[in-house]
Amino acid sequence: MAKVTGLGGIFYKVADTAATQAWYQENLGVGGEWGAMFPFKNDDPEGFTLLSPFKADSDYFAPSGQQFMINLRVDDLDGMIAVLAAKGIEILGRQDEEYGRFAWILDPDGVKVELWQQLGGAPV
């Protein structure tokens, strides 16, 4: 039987695509002609991508007013936070859990971006 094998992309509307792509390139080091592309590798059996709905009244995406949030995997959360803070980007918060370390920022369109350094395997 055919099955879904992973997340193919996140697509959303913004007022100025060039400015948004430039911001992601300059501040997070991701981007290109078609946006941020991440090669699919399956060399880490513990790695995973999550598609997760939130309740309509959840405040987890705050202070963004958007109906979605982008989660980006990082390999060094402390290093990423230092780079972003040096560029004047506000770090909205930090949190460490047994399954990962998190920090949050807003992109220039007001979209909340969750930076995630995975610790351990997928939750059971």
Task: Give the ranges of each region predicted by the language model.
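Vicinal oxygen chelate
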Residues: M1-Y12, G29, E33, I81-V124
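Conserved short beta-strand elements that form part of the metal-binding/catalytic scaffold
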Residues: L28-Q66, L106-P108, K112-G120
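Conserved hydrophobic/aromatic beta-strand scaffold that supports enzyme active sites
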Residues: M37, N71, F102-W104
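Core segments of cupin and vicinal oxygen chelate
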Residues: A2-T5, F11-S52, A86
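Mid-chain, well-packed structural core segment of small domains
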Residues: P63-G88
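Generic anion/oxyanion-binding catalytic loop in active/binding sites
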Residues: G9, D59, Q66-M69, Y99
